[in-house]
């Protein structure tokens, strides 16, 4: 066996693993329509069942976290549409499906077609807001594309009659259900654009099942709505119903009645608006007239102010004011001159020599008196200070001490004798008494004993 052949030998585990990886990578998710059989739900909550047709079958599992989103409980024998991933259970080598979503086959196929067309048209830009046309306000004439015998037309006409009876309505009858309905709807839209009678179109019908509303999920209808030069309001079914026409239309209304309200004006509200505008116009007119009346009054007043008699009276009044001002000015000038003359006379009197001499004499006398008083006060102060100094000197003078019976003895050198150590026998001393001096000679020196000091008690 060659080396290349040996490297291609698989084990069972490797084979199953490789096949699983190939299935998951190459197939990915698929949509599958089939019949359910062998359905079971163990305590784990997962669903296990078989999907089959008349020629083959495949095992399938749907885990609990996924099957919670399913809106129905599958039954054996039920046709379903399943979106699933292909994988392989390696321990047994069985390939199986892991379901991601499930729905009954009828509605499921239609829903799948709806999603595919929606993605296609969205990719082409048919849903972009940049292509949406604004609705006219107000609409001059409304076109309605729907069944002539349906409840939708009755609802639209009833709302328009109630809200805006004067608004013209053109009906383009068409089938809204069945195989021929999409083409009829397309032709009605094209006819309305060809005639150009209306400035807005309502395209819709009443409620129904998904199959009943399927004409408005037709690609031809969607493209006709997109190509319309006239703005289109879609009004298909009830508020919960959503169709491709709703995405393409310039505006979606939840119901035909709501569409009629969107394209019409409320007559009661219109009357209220007109009344409000009339009231505002009346207020504006009243304000305008009041302003003009005030302007006229001001002009009349100005005209009266320009009358010759009034102008003459104003000039006379002005002349009297000027005359009074002139008289007052002359009187003030005279008073100022009089006061100035008086001041000059006073200065002249004060400038005469006799007056100055008299004033100087008075000032000299005053200064002499003040000087005498100052000298007297100063002399008294000196006397007091001298008396105090004498008293203080007398208190510390040695003569005062001698007068009290004491004497002062001096050594031959003239020093005061204070101790026996200063003199010797034969020295001559001079003693000062109160009334003179006495000279003496030392014949004997005696030293006094110091008194004994007592010891302190222990």
From Swiss-Prot:
Family annotation (Pfam families): Exonuc_VII_L, tRNA_anti_2
Cytoplasm found in the keyword field: yes
Enzyme class, spelled out: hydrolase
Reaction catalysed by this enzyme: Exonucleolytic cleavage in either 5'- to 3'- or 3'- to 5'-direction to yield nucleoside 5'-phosphates
EC number: 3.1.11.6
One GO cellular component term: cytoplasm
UniProt subcellular location: Cytoplasm
Quaternary assembly: Heterooligomer composed of large and small subunits.
Sequence similarity: Belongs to the XseA family.
NCBIfam families reported for this sequence: xseA (TIGR00237)
Record-given protein name: Exodeoxyribonuclease 7 large subunit
């Amino acid at each position: 066996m060659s080396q290349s052949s040996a490297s291609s030998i698989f084990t069972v585990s490797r084979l199953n693993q490789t096949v699983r990886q190939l299935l998951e990578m190459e197939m990915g998710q698929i949509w599958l329509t089939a019949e359910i059989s062998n359905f079971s739900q163990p305590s784990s909550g997962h669903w296990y069942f078989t999907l089959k047709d008349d020629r083959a079958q495949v095992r399938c599992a749907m885990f609990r976290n996924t099957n919670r989103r399913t809106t129905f409980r599958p039954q054996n024998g039920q046709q379903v549409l399943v979106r699933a991933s292909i994988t392989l259970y390696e321990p047994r080598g069985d390939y199986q499906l892991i379901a991601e979503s499930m729905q009954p086959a009828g509605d499921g196929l239609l829903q799948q077609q709806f999603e595919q067309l929606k993605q296609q048209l969205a990719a082409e830009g048919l849903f972009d807001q940049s292509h949406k046309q604004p609705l006219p306000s107000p609409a001059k004439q409304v076109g309605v594309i729907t069944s002539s015998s349906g409840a939708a037309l009755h609802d639209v006409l009833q709302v328009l009659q109630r809200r805006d009876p004067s608004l013209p309505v053109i009906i383009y009858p068409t089938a809204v259900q069945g195989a021929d309905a999409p083409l009829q709807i397309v032709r009605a839209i094209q006819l309305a654009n060809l005639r150009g009678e209306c400035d807005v179109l309502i395209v819709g019908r009443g409620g129904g099942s998904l199959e009943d509303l399927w004409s408005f999920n037709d690609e031809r209808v969607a493209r006709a709505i997109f190509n319309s030069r006239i703005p289109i309001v879609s009004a298909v079914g009830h508020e919960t119903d959503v169709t491709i026409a709703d995405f393409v239309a310039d505006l979606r209304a939840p119901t035909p009645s709501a569409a009629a309200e969107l394209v019409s004006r409320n007559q009661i509200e219109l009357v209220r608006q007109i009344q409000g505008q009339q009231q505002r116009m009346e207020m504006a007119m009243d304000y305008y007239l009041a302003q003009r009346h005030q302007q006229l009054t001001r002009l009349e007043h100005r005209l009266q102010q320009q009358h010759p008699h009034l102008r003459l009276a104003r000039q006379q009044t002005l002349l009297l004011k000027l005359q009074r001002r002139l008289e007052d000015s002359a009187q003030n000038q005279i008073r100022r001159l009089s006061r100035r003359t008086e001041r000059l006379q006073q200065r002249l009197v004060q400038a005469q020599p006799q007056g100055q001499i008299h004033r100087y004499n008075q000032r000299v006398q005053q200064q002499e008196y003040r000087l005498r008083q100052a000298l007297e006060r100063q002399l008294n102060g000196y006397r007091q200070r001298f008396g105090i100094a004498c008293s203080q000197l007398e208190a510390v003078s040695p003569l005062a001490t001698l007068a009290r019976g004491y004497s002062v003895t001096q050594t031959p050198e003239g020093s005061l004798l204070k101790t026996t150590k200063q003199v010797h026998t034969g020295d001559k001393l001079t003693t000062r008494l109160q009334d003179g001096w006495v000279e003496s000679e030392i014949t004997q020196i005696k030293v006094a004993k110091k008194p004994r000091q007592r010891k302190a008690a222990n």
